Amino acid sequence: MVKVEVLGMILAGGQGSRLYPLTAKRAKPAVPFGAKYRIIDFVLNNFVNSGIYAIYVLTQYKAQSLTEHIQRYWRFGAFLEDHFILLVPAQMYRYEELGPVWYRGTADAIYQNLHLVHNHAPKAVAVFGGDHIFKMNIRHMVEYHYDTRADITIAAYPVPVAEATRFGVLQVDEEWRITEFQEKPEEPKPIPGRPDMALASMGNYIFRTEALFELLEADARDETSAHDFGKGVIPRAIRVGYRVYAYDFHRNPIPGQEGPNLYWRDVGTLDAYYEASMDLVKVDPVFGLCSPVWPLRTANLFSPPAKFVHETGERVGRALNSLLAGGVIVSGGTVRESVLFRRVRVNSYSLVERSVLFDDVEVGRYCRIRNAIIDKNVKIPPHTEIGYDLELDRARGFTVTPEGVVVVPKGYRF
């Protein structure tokens, strides 16, 4: 195989249990987001926009829709050997060594595919998660990795201490070399001088290739290991003296974007997913989807334009502060602060507000829907209310989150 300078490895095998029922029939990175995208699209765009074109996507859990999406819509030409996005399903590649096991953790997923790294002989390996919403110039992080002569570089993001229990938490010295790593601690240590904030690992790493091999081979021999980067590999690397540095995500320059890079969302819970979706409908969103110099590619499905019809009395088709995909029809209803995916139809006298409606949802007449996520292929009968009586919503079998967001599963029948 052809040699490359930087090899991308995207971890896309997560089960995403905290996103259930959105992950009942799809992998977490395949969950739709932003009216036309899937979550995996954002990290793929980051690699491609950064000029890193040699990418493997490691899959495992309910990967069919993710596989189809990438195979159909993320294809380079056939004539450039160093330009590829290839899916790598869990396949017990080290069966003779490990026995009949799937990926046992994030580190093991890479370990079981080290032969792919070896084939390309890269100078650095970029190991990124496939389930975050952000823009990142990965090339800038790679250059920082080279400049610091790091063995491992970890992208870092300041978060409130109260939220840091969901992340790996970093302690750094004045040169941003990491001195301690805590994986999802119960009592996160704050950033020195900022007692209300902690420095969170974004789960995105750049490895010197030789260091990656050394660390993963040692981890595979450790029968007590969880075979996870955050739980074992990174803390051990710091402990035994590898050069492990934090990279300040806020200093990451995005072409066409002024000021610090502030937006990164781990959409690993239903409430986090919902809030990230609501971020998009703000008048001036921090995370914008429209940039000619940092394009966000996804499937081109050739949907017809969105359509708004009727303007008689209260029967007015309109959408305010919302994102609408192709094929949406708002027929005499009102949509406010919402995200509507392809071919959604909102019929007359209905109100949809602060909600996310996936492909092919139809809202009957005189419905009221608020603070909801409705998965694909749901037909809502006339006069239905969702998000107004949470006990009734629970009785219907809907999920109600701690923040009161109602989630209707795919294909639900009333």
Swiss-Prot record:
The protein's name: Glucose-1-phosphate adenylyltransferase
Catalysed reaction equations from the record: alpha-D-glucose 1-phosphate + ATP + H(+) = ADP-alpha-D-glucose + diphosphate
PANTHER family: GLUCOSE-1-PHOSPHATE ADENYLYLTRANSFERASE, GLUCOSE-1-PHOSPHATE ADENYLYLTRANSFERASE-RELATED
Record Pfam families: Hexapep_GlmU, NTP_transferase
Family of this protein: Belongs to the bacterial/plant glucose-1-phosphate adenylyltransferase family.
Protein residues bound to alpha-D-glucose 1-phosphate: 103, 168, 183-184, 201
SUPFAM superfamilies: Nucleotide-diphospho-sugar transferases (SSF53448), Trimeric LpxA-like enzymes (SSF51161)
Record keyword ATP-binding present: yes
Disulfide bond annotation, renumbered to this chain: none
Transport is among the record's keywords: no
Subunit and partners: Homotetramer.
Keywords: ATP-binding, Carbohydrate metabolism, Glycogen biosynthesis, Glycogen metabolism, Nucleotide-binding, Nucleotidyltransferase, Transferase
Biological function: Involved in the biosynthesis of ADP-glucose, a building block required for the elongation reactions to produce glycogen. Catalyzes the reaction between ATP and alpha-D-glucose 1-phosphate (G1P) to produce pyrophosphate and ADP-Glc.
EC number, UniProt record: 2.7.7.27
GO terms, molecular function: ATP binding; glucose-1-phosphate adenylyltransferase activity
GO biological process, one term: glycogen biosynthetic process
Annotated pathway: Glycan biosynthesis; glycogen biosynthesis
Top EC class of this enzyme: transferase
